[in-house]
């Protein structure tokens, strides 16, 4: 049975030990308890994230509920009145059964796998550097490929422009030959006309087109040299990037596709609908995308835009020059053909006039001969022995009548007057006949000049139409400009001179 001690007796200290000794033991226990709580709290705090430390002024269950609230799934309304639960965005482990997604946990102390984690991190950095180097090399290779394509396009356009320039130069040679051929016309046909003005105008226009084509050739040559220099720079950077990594068994185009890229121009451009492109990293002197690569790619982009504009301009100028040259040639040929038709019309008129004058000359010549015959008949024979009795001026009848005073007959005077009058008319007729012959000669010379002029203009038109054909090259047209008369055959070669 339990014995109850009275209060007076309970207050009495029955312990044997000294109070100081007991206080020292209790102080040591309290110190150990405080140290145990502090070390345990610090150990737990070291393993917890920084944001997981709860406020000591808030109840533990309330603080924990507020802490894990962002981890819970979010309920969203969908069309039709239903709901859809989605995990919160960000990194972490999705717990579908508990409908929570805790964030990634980062320890503040090294874990037991710290060495392996650091090795994996180093490997990841090295692989990232290799991927970046391969991506930069792929971009450089793609840029070099596009620069090569643009160089080929520029070379083809230069061939077209050079062909057009040779056509313009051939047009200048044809113009020079046309002027030279027209210089062989007679002096009367060299009166300045619209055909000469058209030839002069054609020469000036062809010179202007020649200067335009030469400027395009010079500009394209400078651009071609710049593109070649940029290509060499891209090739050097490309090989330099490939020296930093070990090549994998995949083409560099696959590297761009793995990076979700379909172009090397700019990683910050608007992505395609299928992929989300990565942004171009800033140039890093010690990284994979160094300033030299950035400068080479920027120069390549600038040259691609500039060369595209230059190609469009050169193609447009070539088309304009071709059409303009054809129109000018057609207008000059039309003016020369019109001049030839006008010359033919004048030649026909001169030919008709010459025919009429030839008939008049024949009639005048015949009439002059008849007048000479009449003049001879009036004057009579040269010898008296040939005179008939009825024609003698001293025949018996006349002598018998003229014996009387004042009976002189006017027969001799009348014959002399008629002879003189007939002689004057013959002289006047011969003068007119000389004028007719001189005019006939001038008309014949003019008709011959018109024939030569018509033939020369026709030859010039045929020459121009024949030489402007595409199969006639510049060298063939250059052989036409020689210092020889086209009306004379060219000298034969020594091999064909002697059989």
Swiss-Prot record:
Its main location: cytoplasm. The modification Phosphotyrosine is found at residue 372. InterPro entries: Tektin-like, TEKTL1. The keyword Zinc does not apply. GO terms for biological process: flagellated sperm motility. Keywords: Cell projection, Cilium, Coiled coil, Cytoplasm, Cytoskeleton, Flagellum, Phosphoprotein. Residues 197-227, 297-317 form a coiled coil. One of its GO terms (cellular component) is sperm flagellum. It is found in: Cytoplasm, Cytoskeleton, Flagellum axoneme. Pfam families: Tektin. Microtubule inner protein (MIP) part of the dynein-decorated doublet microtubules (DMTs) in sperm flagellar axoneme, which is required for motile flagellum beating. Forms an extensive interaction network cross-linking the lumen of axonemal doublet microtubules. Microtubule inner protein component of sperm flagellar doublet microtubules. This is Tektin-like protein 1. It comes from Homo sapiens. The lineage of its organism: Eukaryota, Metazoa, Chordata, Craniata, Vertebrata.
